[in-house]
């Protein structure tokens, strides 16, 4: 079974995502659904476990529909030895407010919450526990552990963690936005990407010269080839004030001619291109990359020594 590091302890949404990815047979070399979860204390620690060989893969959150992308994940992917994305899954996220058995809402003075979770239930807490004192937790499951061990009165946590620690629920299905979702990635050391499925995503990190028009020129490599971008985001390079790297996700696979040509052009144009992978999403996008054009087919036939196979465009 594949050792997969994740933000622990047992009972986090990340563990649920890990189990879903494994059950779907999306772990390279382990399509039997088997996985050995390896809980760690943070998302960067999960990725470092892959880099050091302590785990074969890591399952980490990358973005949620409430607060957007998660900076610790982005930074850990861009800095350090290269890693690659092999699969993803998206979970509907709703929280439970839990206490020890016999504790009522009127008894709650302190509440533990993972900061990402606290941001997604802020309105509920204001309405139902306006005077509660918030205590930080390093994960949703850690918040539940703090309640079970008597460190706080209540926690914002996952149903999985609540069941694991045998806690009592004050409220279930708590979330300020009813369509809250979080996307998770399966990440390993670089290797051959999963085969093209037609519903794929490709991601890169671009470092470009700090000159006028440089970003526009880089993005034009996608636009001129009809490639749809699904995300573009900047993060500091940490090498100097005002210097940034750019995370770009696009529809398509490195096996698509248009995507491959864009990546080659970016490699020539940018100071650095870090390829984060091409992987199946299971989602159909309207802007699929265009198929190989007639000129590309003609060139491939020349390489194969078959110039007569293509009649060329009509005169």
From Swiss-Prot:
EC number(s) reported in the record: 4.2.1.51
GO molecular function: prephenate dehydratase activity; protein homodimerization activity
Keywords: Amino-acid biosynthesis, Aromatic amino acid biosynthesis, Lyase, Phenylalanine biosynthesis
Reaction catalysed by this enzyme: prephenate + H(+) = 3-phenylpyruvate + CO2 + H2O
Pfam families, alphabetized: ACT, PDT
Gene Ontology cellular component list: cytoplasm
Domain ACT residues, every copy: 203-280
Domain Prephenate dehydratase: 3-189
BP GO terms, sorted: L-phenylalanine biosynthetic process
Class of this enzyme: lyase
Name used for this protein in its record: Prephenate dehydratase
Coiled coil residues, start to end: none
InterPro entries, per the entry: ACT-like_dom_sf, ACT_dom, Chor_mutase/pphenate_deHydtase, Preph_deHydtase, Preph_deHydtase_CS
Pathway recorded for this protein: Amino-acid biosynthesis; L-phenylalanine biosynthesis; phenylpyruvate from prephenate: step 1/1
């Amino acid at each position: 079974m594949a050792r997969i590091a994740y933000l622990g302890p047992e009972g986090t949404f990340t563990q649920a995502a890990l189990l879903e990815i494994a059950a779907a047979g999306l772990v390279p070399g382990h399509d039997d659904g088997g996985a050995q979860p390896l809980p760690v204390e943070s998302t960067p620690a999960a990725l470092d476990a892959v880099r050091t060989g302590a785990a074969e893969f890591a399952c980490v959150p990358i973005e949620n529909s409430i607060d957007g992308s998660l900076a610790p994940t982005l930074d850990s992917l861009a800095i350090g030895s290269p890693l690659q994305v092999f699969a993803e899954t998206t979970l509907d996220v709703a929280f439970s407010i839990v206490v020890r058995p016999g504790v009522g809402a009127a008894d709650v003075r302190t509440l533990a919450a993972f900061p990402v979770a606290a941001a997604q239930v802020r309105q509920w807490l204001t309405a139902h526990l306006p005077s509660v004192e918030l205590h930080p937790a390093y994960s949703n499951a850690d918040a539940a552990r703090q309640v079970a061990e008597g460190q706080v009165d209540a926690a914002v946590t996952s149903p999985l963690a609540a069941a694991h620690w045998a806690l009592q629920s004050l409220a279930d299905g708590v979330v300020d936005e009813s369509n809250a979702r979080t996307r998770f990635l399966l990440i390993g050391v670089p290797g051959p990407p999963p085969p093209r499925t037609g519903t794929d995503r490709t991601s890169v990190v671009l470092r470009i010269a700090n000159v006028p028009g440089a970003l526009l020129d880089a993005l034009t490599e996608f636009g001129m080839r009809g490639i749809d971008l699904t995300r573009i985001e900047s993060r500091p390079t940490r090498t100097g004030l005002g210097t940034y790297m750019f995370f770009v996700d696009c529809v398509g696979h490195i096996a698509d001619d248009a995507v491959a040509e864009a990546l080659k052009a970016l490699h020539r144009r940018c100071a650095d291109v870090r390829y984060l992978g091409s992987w199946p999403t299971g989602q159909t996008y309207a802007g699929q990359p265009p198929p190989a054009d007639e000129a590309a087919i003609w060139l491939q036939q020349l390489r194969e020594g078959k110039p007569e196979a293509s009649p060329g465009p009509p005169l």
